[in-house]
A protein has these predicted regions:
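Cytosolic covalent-transfer regions centered on His/Cys nucleophiles
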Residues: 1-226
Length: 226
C-alpha cells in the first residue's frame, strides 16, 4: 500500500465509518474500488473525487466526522489558513477563468504561494472535471491534486464577487462567495472542505458575509462560526 492507494482500514479511519459497511459499499459498486490479492484497495484520488461530489449532500453529523478526523473540531481550521490580506470584498470577474486567475492573485497575498502558475493550472484542470460551485451561492475552487511543492503552507482565500457568476451549481443559483482552498496534503484538504460545507449551512453566517464591510469583519465572522 502506498500514498496513492488506501486499504479498507485506512479508508474506514479517514471516513470514520465501519470497515464492514465500506466493504458492502465497495462490493455493490457504490465506492470506487478494486480487488487486489483478495483485498479491497481504493485509489486516493478517486476516493477524494467521490467524496467531493457527495459533500454537499452530507448531513452536519456526517460532515462533523470528516471535519474532526484529523484535529479537534473546535480548532480554528479555515481561519488558520485565511490571512486577512487574502480576503477580497469586491472581486470583478466575468468568467470562471478570470475568477480563478484573480483568486490565485488574492491567495498570493498570503506569501505562501510559491508557484502561482502551477496552482492556476491545477485549479483549471479541476474545474474542467466538474464545477466546484455548491449550494447557497458558494464555490470552493481547489486544485485537481495536492501541490506541496507549490505551497509554503496550506492556504484559503476568500472573495465576494462584485457581480455573481453562473458556475453551474446544482441548485441553479449564481455564485457570489468564493473560498479557494489549496492544501499541502489530502487529509487537510478534506477536513477544510468538510468544515466549509458545515459553515455554509448557516444562513445567518452567509447573510452576514454578504454585507460585511471589511476583511477583518469577514475573518471575525468565520472565526466565531468555527
Amino acid at each position: 500500500m502506498n500514498e496513492s492507494t488506501l486499504s479498507i482500514k485506512q479508508l474506514a479511519d479517514m471516513l470514520r465509518q465501519d470497515a464492514r459497511d465500506l466493504e458492502k459499499m465497495a462490493s455493490r459498486g457504490y465506492l470506487p474500488a478494486r480487488r487486489v490479492g483478495g483485498e479491497w484497495t481504493f485509489a486516493t484520488a478517486e476516493i477524494h473525487e467521490w467524496l467531493e461530489k457527495r459533500l454537499p449532500d452530507y448531513s452536519d453529523d456526517e460532515l462533523s466526522r470528516l471535519d474532526s478526523s484529523h484535529a479537534p473540531s473546535n480548532d480554528l481550521l479555515v481561519c488558520s489558513m485565511l490571512a486577512q490580506d487574502s480576503i477580497e470584498l469586491d472581486l470583478h470577474a466575468r468568467t470562471r477563468t478570470s475568477m480563478l486567475h484573480e483568486m490565485v492573485k488574492i491567495a498570493e497575498r498570503s506569501w505562501q504561494i510559491w508557484d502561482p502558475q502551477a496552482l492556476l493550472a491545477s485549479l483549471r484542470e479541476r474545474e474542467q472535471r466538474s464545477t466546484t460551485a455548491v449550494a447557497n451561492g458558494v464555490a470552493f475552487p481547489h486544485p485537481a491534486r495536492r501541490l506541496p511543492d507549490a505551497l509554503g503552507e496550506s492556504v484559503v482565500a476568500f472573495a465576494r464577487m462584485a457581480e455573481p457568476l453562473n458556475l453551474g451549481a446544482a441548485d441553479n443559483r449564481t455564485t457570489d462567495l468564493v473560498f479557494m482552498v489549496a492544501c499541502r496534503n489530502d487529509a487537510t484538504h478534506l477536513q477544510v472542505l468538510a468544515r466549509l460545507s458545515r459553515l455554509i449551512m448557516r444562513e445567518e453566517l452567509m447573510d452576514a458575509l454578504r454585507v460585511a464591510t471589511s476583511p477583518r469583519a469577514i475573518w471575525d465572522l468565520l472565526a466565531e462560526a468555527e
